[in-house]
């Protein structure tokens, strides 16, 4: 084997030209000397293309190019729905931002971080520091550690400024049903979840987010992002966005199609607006990327507006500056919608943001640099690469009525950001092709009680019915017909398994099932008694990921997501949903209850708990966070008194702020803990402990 590899290596060396051999040696030498040469930030075709399109105002081209060659500044966003967001902001301002202007890195004086003028409540900040400098500089190590720990705990998100724009324009309310079509890696999804939980006093908002991505591996990155926020209102699914299935929900005894109030359509794009952070784009950029993605972008956006509710809002966005991926897609949607869609004027919703209006005239260029003014000029040989929808409409009056000036193009040099495009669409009526959709014709069902029918046939018919069971849609008003089974009782199957093995090929890897607890499940009564759960506690929203054996962990979803899960198990590939609220003790029921509380779900569960609660002071919180298993004597007398009245087992540790003492911590804190024989300990992740200590006590 070794001799064969040597022969192959020699053969490859002999086949190289002298110039190739010289380049290879140069690369190896550069690697030995400490790294490869930097990518030259220059692309003549890119400059020629955008200068011809005139998307940059006259006299600003040099500033535009200079900005693209500079590294992207670091931007952070403070999680808005957390009750201690104001405390985090105060900590950043007083303990970190004030020190930064006194620090120099590589001879460069650091500017004081500034809030993004257009983001609400000063919850987003940017600095002239790049992420690389923050990571590598010893002078900024303390600041970097704070950012890392706060990011892991979900209190801060490090997110590019322009990527914060689409969720803001969605104008999310807590009751909205939301679809994020291309969600990974999940920073925008996290922002949407925050908006759903704007009122922390409501543990289960009526709305929810279904976050989808076509890449199975990136779905797990999405799960990691969402888990930081500990929401019971998020579901991660794995589908091709251009054919994401239409889901069903039960409403007043009938099954109807789920239409979303808000849809985020952040489509795959060529990414030439990200040159400041993805420097590979400089050498790889051609117009071919945009031409190849245009069709997919239209299909995804079309599927989005089909599933949008009337009066709903869809935000279409790309990190590309190319009109083939931007205005051309919007024009195609508006044209075939026949008045069902309109562009919304959202300029007033982002005061302080600088942006350029959408353009109405552009040309299409091939990767070789050949220009085409209109579709009729394109030779037949190019028809597979260039499509009619890539060009502006010939009807100028119709084009003008589309109000493309309401589209927003963000240029990097205007506010030191990346490049971005965003448009907001409002659905006024059903799409034309949905209006023409005929009613579904149903064949009389085969009764499973009919002894004359072979059991195998009955089973096959039942399987087919389960897969194809969609409600009949009224072609005139989009309403659905009531759906009942033959016995007159509603379907209450509590097991949401993945699709059958034959269908599983469509969806990729098999996931564990989602099994909801039944109303009379014996494991719930001891839990309810031990923690004195309120009768209003929605126990039917508890689920586990196993059908057999002991239930080690219990998760919780909102009522609305339970509805979605129960009626669509055959249609969708669910990667993750719900938050962990209870974990099984290693010692079983030795301490009064077989399940202890989980920190991830405590903010959702706490409003229903009426027992096992210790009210603690700030000093007690410090003891809990800095000591692993402190004795009772370490706590205040009041805490010791409360603890003496509790048996061993899982407990809630609650800190309530005192408005009469404004100099003390002014946000509530809820921690999970364990009352031992002579001690109390907190069940809080190590990183979460660190960040709590940092912003409360340091």
From Swiss-Prot:
<dbReference type="InterPro" id="IPR001678">
    <property type="entry name" value="MeTrfase_RsmB-F_NOP2_dom"/>
</dbReference>
<feature type="compositionally biased region" description="Basic and acidic residues">
    <location>
        <begin position="11"/>
        <end position="28"/>
    </location>
</feature>
<keyword id="KW-0496">Mitochondrion</keyword>
<dbReference type="GO" id="GO:0005634">
    <property type="term" value="C:nucleus"/>
</dbReference>
<dbReference type="GO" id="GO:0000049">
    <property type="term" value="F:tRNA binding"/>
</dbReference>
<keyword id="KW-0808">Transferase</keyword>
<keyword id="KW-0489">Methyltransferase</keyword>
<keyword id="KW-0820">tRNA-binding</keyword>
<dbReference type="GO" id="GO:0005737">
    <property type="term" value="C:cytoplasm"/>
</dbReference>
<dbReference type="GO" id="GO:2000736">
    <property type="term" value="P:regulation of stem cell differentiation"/>
</dbReference>
<dbReference type="GO" id="GO:0062152">
    <property type="term" value="F:mRNA (cytidine-5-)-methyltransferase activity"/>
</dbReference>
<dbReference type="GO" id="GO:0005739">
    <property type="term" value="C:mitochondrion"/>
</dbReference>
<comment type="similarity">
    <text>Belongs to the class I-like SAM-binding methyltransferase superfamily. RsmB/NOP family. TRM4 subfamily.</text>
</comment>
<dbReference type="GO" id="GO:0030488">
    <property type="term" value="P:tRNA methylation"/>
</dbReference>
<keyword id="KW-0694">RNA-binding</keyword>
<dbReference type="InterPro" id="IPR023270">
    <property type="entry name" value="RCMT_NCL1"/>
</dbReference>
<keyword id="KW-0949">S-adenosyl-L-methionine</keyword>
<feature type="region of interest" description="Disordered">
    <location>
        <begin position="472"/>
        <end position="496"/>
    </location>
</feature>
<comment type="function">
    <text>RNA cytosine C(5)-methyltransferase that methylates cytosine to 5-methylcytosine (m5C) in various RNAs, such as tRNAs, mRNAs and some long non-coding RNAs (lncRNAs). Involved in various processes, such as epidermal stem cell differentiation, testis differentiation and maternal to zygotic transition during early development: acts by increasing protein synthesis; cytosine C(5)-methylation promoting tRNA stability and preventing mRNA decay.</text>
</comment>
<keyword id="KW-0539">Nucleus</keyword>
<keyword id="KW-0963">Cytoplasm</keyword>
<feature type="region of interest" description="Disordered">
    <location>
        <begin position="1"/>
        <end position="28"/>
    </location>
</feature>
<dbReference type="InterPro" id="IPR023267">
    <property type="entry name" value="RCMT"/>
</dbReference>
<dbReference type="InterPro" id="IPR029063">
    <property type="entry name" value="SAM-dependent_MTases_sf"/>
</dbReference>
<dbReference type="GO" id="GO:0016428">
    <property type="term" value="F:tRNA (cytidine-5-)-methyltransferase activity"/>
</dbReference>
<feature type="binding site">
    <location>
        <position position="266"/>
    </location>
    <ligand>
        <name>S-adenosyl-L-methionine</name>
    </ligand>
</feature>
<feature type="compositionally biased region" description="Basic residues">
    <location>
        <begin position="1"/>
        <end position="10"/>
    </location>
</feature>
<dbReference type="Pfam" id="PF25376">
    <property type="entry name" value="Pre-PUA_NSUN2"/>
</dbReference>
<feature type="compositionally biased region" description="Polar residues">
    <location>
        <begin position="482"/>
        <end position="493"/>
    </location>
</feature>
<dbReference type="GO" id="GO:0070062">
    <property type="term" value="C:extracellular exosome"/>
</dbReference>
<protein>
    <recommendedName>
        <fullName>RNA cytosine-C(5)-methyltransferase NSUN2</fullName>
        <ecNumber>2.1.1.-</ecNumber>
        <ecNumber>2.1.1.203</ecNumber>
    </recommendedName>
</protein>
<dbReference type="GO" id="GO:0005730">
    <property type="term" value="C:nucleolus"/>
</dbReference>
<feature type="binding site">
    <location>
        <position position="240"/>
    </location>
    <ligand>
        <name>S-adenosyl-L-methionine</name>
    </ligand>
</feature>
<keyword id="KW-0206">Cytoskeleton</keyword>
<dbReference type="GO" id="GO:0036416">
    <property type="term" value="P:tRNA stabilization"/>
</dbReference>
<keyword id="KW-0964">Secreted</keyword>
<keyword id="KW-0597">Phosphoprotein</keyword>
<keyword id="KW-0819">tRNA processing</keyword>
<feature type="binding site">
    <location>
        <begin position="182"/>
        <end position="188"/>
    </location>
    <ligand>
        <name>S-adenosyl-L-methionine</name>
    </ligand>
</feature>
<dbReference type="InterPro" id="IPR049560">
    <property type="entry name" value="MeTrfase_RsmB-F_NOP2_cat"/>
</dbReference>
<dbReference type="GO" id="GO:0010793">
    <property type="term" value="P:regulation of mRNA export from nucleus"/>
</dbReference>
<dbReference type="Pfam" id="PF01189">
    <property type="entry name" value="Methyltr_RsmB-F"/>
</dbReference>
